[in-house]
């Protein structure tokens, strides 16, 4: 049994709530609550979808940041990247266009090939690539060590005053080509000057090991020169005594 609210007779009719009006108010409140729930649910679902999208985006960026596999051939000593000064990089880019190369790597290879003489003069040994990139035949280890030994010998002889400079005078003012007598020409005769004795060459039997025959050959050549001048001295003395 539903109890109806008592109506106040003193109040006007429009202020006294009827049952129909109460039912309408109840339905309207229920609709508002349902509408609020729907709006809240949609917002919550939208937020969840946004969070899922953010997670997917983060995973995609992490996969994108992974280093790509190196598709080039593996070469000993090869780094993934070479940092160049800005001017050098710009010049290499310009040379690549001027020379018609396909990449900057070809230009660098071309520069190394043409700079090989300067590299040899600066480092003696030069560069040693893993594969042949120089069109000319590379120098052997024997020739490289011969070159270094020759330079060391020349430096020592200059310090001792036994090597003539370009003007024809020796270092330190000591000239073996003048003032000795016996018709002795000094340094060039014993193979230390500009005219080397034929056949007297420095050879290497192994890398970094001198051939003992070289010293024997040098001793024989020096003995032959000294014996030749001694024989001429004896002939000159005999002629002076005979006269």
Swiss-Prot record:
A Pfam family hit: TCP
UniProt-annotated stretches for the region Disordered: 1-55
A molecular-function term among this protein's GO annotations: DNA-binding transcription factor activity
Residue spans of biased composition, Basic and acidic residues class: 22-35
InterPro entries named in the record: TF_TCP_subgr (IPR017887), Transcription_factor_TCP (IPR005333)
Cellular localization per UniProt: Nucleus
DNA-binding in keyword set: yes
Domain of life of the source: Eukaryota
One GO cellular component term noted in the UniProt record for this chain: nucleus
Compositional bias (Polar residues): 8-21
Example of a GO biological process term: regulation of DNA-templated transcription
Annotated coiled-coil segments of the chain: 42-66
Subunit structure: Interacts with SPL.
Protein's name in the database: Transcription factor TCP6
Gene behind the chain: TCP6
């Amino acid at each position: 049994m539903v109890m109806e609210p008592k109506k106040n007779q003193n109040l006007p009719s429009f202020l006294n709530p009827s049952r129909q009006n109460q039912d309408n108010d109840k339905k309207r409140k229920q609709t508002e609550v349902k509408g609020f729930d729907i709006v809240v649910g949609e917002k919550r679902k939208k937020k969840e979808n946004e969070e899922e999208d953010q997670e997917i985006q983060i995973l995609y960026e992490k996969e994108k940041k992974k280093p790509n596999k190196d598709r080039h051939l593996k070469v000993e000593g090869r780094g993934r990247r070479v940092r160049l000064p800005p001017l050098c990089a710009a010049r290499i880019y310009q040379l690549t266009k001027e020379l018609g190369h396909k990449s900057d790597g070809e230009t660098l290879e071309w520069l190394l090939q043409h700079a090989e003489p300067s590299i040899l003069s600066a480092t003696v040994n030069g560069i040693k690539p893993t594969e042949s990139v120089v069109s000319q035949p590379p120098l052997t280890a024997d020739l490289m060590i011969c070159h270094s030994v020759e330079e060391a010998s020349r430096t020592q002889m200059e310090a001792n005053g036994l090597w003539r400079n370009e003007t024809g005078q020796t270092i330190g003012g000591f000239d073996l080509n003048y003032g000795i007598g016996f018709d002795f020409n000094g340094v060039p005769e014993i193979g230390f000057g500009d005219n080397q004795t034929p056949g007297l060459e420095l050879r290497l039997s192994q890398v970094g090991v001198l051939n003992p025959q070289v010293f024997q050959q040098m001793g024989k050549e020096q003995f032959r020169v000294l014996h030749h001048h001694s024989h001429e001295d004896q002939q000159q003395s005999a002629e002076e005594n005979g006269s």
